[in-house]
Amino acid sequence: MGHRIPEETIEAIRRGVDIVDVIGEYVQLKRQGRNYFGLCPFHGEKTPSFSVSPEKQIFHCFGCGAGGNAFTFLMDIEGIPFVEAAKRLAAKAGVDLSVYELDVRGRDDGQTDEAKAMTEAHALLKRFYHHLLVHTKEGQAALDYLQARGWTKETIDRFEIGYAPDAPDAAAKLLESHSFSLPVMEKAGLLTKKEDGRYVGRFRNRIMFPIHDHRGETVGFSGRLLGEGHPKYVNSPETPVFRKGAILYHFHAARVPIRKRQEALLVEGFADVISAAQAGIDYAIATMGTSLTEEQARILRPCDTITICYDGDRAGIEAAWAAAEQLSALGCRVKVASLPNGLDPDEYIRVYGGERFAGEAGCRRPLVAFKMAYLRRGKNLQHEGERLRYIDEALREIGKLSSPVEQDYYLRQLAEEFSLSLSALHEQLSRSQRERTKPREAPDGETARPMLAKKLLPAFQNAERLLLAHMMRSRDVALVVQERIGGRFNIEEHRALAAYIYAFYEEGHEADPGALISRIPGELQPLASDVSLLLIADDVSEQELEDYIRHVLNRPKWLMLKVKEQEKTEAERRKDFLTAARIAKEMIEMKKMLSSS
C-alpha cells in the first residue's frame, strides 16, 4: 500500500509551480500592479474581481469569496480530490510521485476499499456491456435499435452505451472471475440475491447508459428494456458511490465546454443530452428525469448563464419553473428554451434535426419573459379579477430584476398590453418592493460577504482581520498576538485561523502565506486568502499593533457595557432607582477603564 504524500513533498510541488501559470490555463489574467486579475471561473461576473498573487502563490475572489492555493484551485475547478490535484501539479513541477503511486491513483483520500471496489466493478461492467453492444451478435438488436433512432457509432462510443445480456448470471460470473465480493457487488447495486442464495444481474436484456460522477468515475447505470415489457427503465439504487441527487449526467465531460462558453444547457434525460451532443451541443447536462436538487443547483452556480430546456409538456414546463426558481435564488442568470408541440429535446432533434434544435436553444427567453408566459396559463385575461391577479403576479417577478432598464422594459409591455399608466405600474412596483424589503439579520455563524466594503465592518472586526494579515507575514507579530490575545479573537473563524497560524510558526516555519494556506482546512482557505491579500505595510508599528489588540480585547467589555445599559433601563422601568444608580456608577467606571486602555 502506498503512503500519504509527505508535507515536504507537497511543499516541493507548491514551490515548483507558478499559480499564475496554473490558473492561466483556465482564466484570462491581466497584470495590475503586483497581482493578476480576471473573471472568476467560480461565479458569473462582468467585472474582474478574481485576484491571483504571484508573490504569495494564492488566489482570492472578492465577489464570491473563493480562495486558496494552486491545489485548492485545481480541486475546485476540476472537481477532483487532493491527491489527483497533487499528481497533476507534480507533473508540472517535475516532482516524482511514483513511490506514492497507489495513493495518487486512489481518487479520494477518504474512499474505502469497498467503495473503490464498487467503482472498479462499474468500470469493468461498462466495458463488458459496451463490447457486447458493438462487437457481438448478442448485442446486434440493441445496436440496430440505437442506430435506427439516429445515434451514430461515434456517439455510441462517446457515451459508452452498452447492452446487458438476458443471461441472469452473466454479470455475477464476470465479477466473480475478477475476484470481486458478490455481497459487496449487491451493495453496489449491480447484483441482486435470490431466495436460493444465487446472485443474478440487476440489469438484463437492457440498453445500458453508464452514469459518471463529476470526476469521471463510473458509479451507476440506467438500463432501458429492449423490446416490450415493464419496467421500461431500471436504475442503479442509492449506494455508497452513487447519489442520484448529487450528480448531473454528463457533467464530467461537459465541464470544460461549459466553462469555455460560460453557459450550460440543462435538460431532463440521458437521451436529450446524447442527441444534443450529436448535434454539436457539448455543454448539455441532465438531471436524469428528477427535479433539480439543491446539490445539483450548486454545481451549476459558477456558470454565467444556464438555459433550461425541459420537455414542452405541462409537467416539463412546471419543472422548468421550479428549476429556474432554485437557480435564480442562488444568483444564476437563467434563460428558458421552450420547444413546440410538447416535444422533449431528443424528440425535437429526431423530428427537425440538430441544426434547428441549436437554433431553438439559442432563441431562449429571459427568465422573466418565460415566467410571464407561464403565469398567463389557465387565466382568462378578459376577466377583470384574473387580469388583475396576473398583473400583480407579473409585477412580483419584475420586481426581482436588479436592472432598472429590464424592469422598465417589462413594465412598458404590461402598460401597453393592458392600457395601463406606466407611472401607476412603477408606483405599484415600488410599493410592493418596500413591503418586501425589510432588514434581515444574517443567520448565526454566517460571515459577511467579501464584497462588503471593509470600511463598513465594525472596528474590532477590521482590527482582527488586520492582525491576522500581519501575523501571516510576520512570525514576530504572531508571537506578540499569541501572548497578548491567544484564543480571544471575537469571531470564531478568526480564532480558528489564528490557531493555525500559531501552530505553523511553532513547527519552525518562516513566514510564508502560501505555505501556511496549504496547511489550512478548505473551509478556512477563502478567509485566509482574503486576509493575506489585504493591503498593509510591510512593517507594523508598536502603536498600530497596540491599537489593534486593544480593539480586540475591548470588544467583550463594550458588549458587557451594553448589557449594563439594558439592566439600568430595566431597573428604571421597575422604578428601582437605587439599583439603576448603582449600575450607572458601574458603567461610568467601565467607560473610564475603556477610555484609558
UniProtKB/Swiss-Prot annotation:
Stretches with biased composition (Basic and acidic residues): 429-447
Highest taxon listed in the record's lineage: Bacteria
Family affiliation: Belongs to the DnaG primase family.
Pfam families for the chain: DnaB_bind, DNAG_N, Toprim_2, Zn_ribbon_DnaG
Catalytic activity, EC: 2.7.7.101
UniProt cross-references to CDD domains, sorted A to Z: TOPRIM_DnaG_primases
Native organism: Geobacillus stearothermophilus
Name of this protein: DNA primase
